[in-house]
From Swiss-Prot:
It comes from Methanococcus maripaludis (strain C7 / ATCC BAA-1331). Its EC number is 2.1.3.2. Pfam families: OTCace (PF00185), OTCace_N (PF02729). GO terms for biological process: 'de novo' pyrimidine nucleobase biosynthetic process; 'de novo' UMP biosynthetic process; amino acid metabolic process. Pathway: Pyrimidine metabolism; UMP biosynthesis via de novo pathway; (S)-dihydroorotate from bicarbonate: step 2/3. The keyword Magnesium does not apply. This is Aspartate carbamoyltransferase catalytic subunit. It comes from the Archaea. L-aspartate binds at K82, R164, R223.
Length: 302
């Protein structure tokens, strides 16, 4: 694995390898809190869009591996404001670092970065396209909290049009056997047809607008993303259309996930019930990103 840009680029065995490595990293965190696998190495974090969990978990992961971090979170302090192209920025920064993690508002920016980099590039989110490290931590959460990925029933609820985490996760789940997916969204925010066509026939798929979750293993809630709407009036038409409360949760074994940040789609009272795993899901971002950084670096020096 030279870069991690899209879930389409990696197969089932590579996914399982990353998940197995993540278990080792979690054990290290629980035992010692750190190791020296990437001692003296540098990760560049280039965040052209706001981020809390993804950026900080990448930085934490690199430091837990013994490495260091450089980067930016505010493009107004960079040469982007002078008109420097993304390709040129990557060519320069790949000379300063051993790995790059980039978040960018434009679809395809991570792919372009990988084509201009001397070092491995990790897509930390490119517009509404892909978010592969989130997908891998989601799969890890499912494996750890449900106990299995195959023979899985999962309901995705909310913004399935702009939600890059959902696009990536559906594509990854299509590689596993006997997966059933419910896509629950208003007409304005349905899953893009190209994603449906990509996964159709590989798993059991149903689309609906009403919330039906009593028979699923996982409920995956998503935020309605105001920043993705060209017309803000369209956002207000669907804002708050789905709100998960304790009354909706009749299945004591269901696992409730959310990529975060949350706005109003999950009542805060849900946080205190055992089915809520979204904060644990967020924690899993550290061992999973540790595994990704370690494996990518090892592959880059072979």
């Amino acid at each position: 694995m030279r870069h991690l840009i899209s879930m389409r680029d990696i197969g089932r065995e590579e996914i399982l390898n990353i998940l197995n490595e993540s278990e080792k990293m979690e054990a290290i965190l629980n035992e010692n809190g750190h190791c020296d696998f990437l001692n003296g190495r540098i990760l560049a974090t280039l965040f052209y869009e706001p981020s809390t969990r993804t950026r900080l978990s990448f930085e934490t992961a690199m430091k837990r591996l013994g490495g260091n971090v450089i980067g930016f979170t505010d493009i107004s302090n960079t040469s982007v404001t002078k008109g420097e192209s993304l390709a040129d920025t990557i060519k320069v920064i790949s000379g300063y670092s051993d790995l790059i993690a980039i978040r960018h508002p434009s679809e395809g920016a991570a792919r372009l970065s990988s084509e201009n980099s001397k070092v491995p590039v990790i897509n930390a989110g490119d517009g509404s396209n892909q978010h592969p490290t989130q997908t891998l931590l989601d799969l890890y959460t499912i494996k750890r909290e449900v106990g299995h990925i195959e023979n899985l029933k999962i309901a995705f609820i909310g913004d399935l049009k702009y939600g890059r985490t959902v696009h990536s996760l559906c594509q990854a789940l299509s590689l596993f056997k006997s997966v059933e997916i419910k896509l629950i969204a208003p007409d304005e925010l349905k899953m893009p047809r190209e994603v449906i066509e990509d996964i159709d026939g590989k798993l059991k798929l149903s689309e609906m607008t009403d919330v039906e979750i009593d028979d699923v293993d996982v409920v995956y809630m998503t935020r309605i993303q105001k920043e993705r709407f060209v017309d803000v009036n369209e956002y207000y038409k669907v804002k708050g259309i789905y709100r998960l409360s304790k009354e909706h949760i009749g299945n004591k074994n269901v696992v409730i996930m959310h990529p975060l940040p949350r706005v109003d789609e999950i009542d805060s009272e849900v946080d205190n019930i055992p089915q809520a795993r979204y904060f644990k899901q967020s924690f899993y971002g550290v061992p999973v990103r540790m595994a990704i950084l370690k494996l990518l670096f090892e592959d880059s020096i072979k």
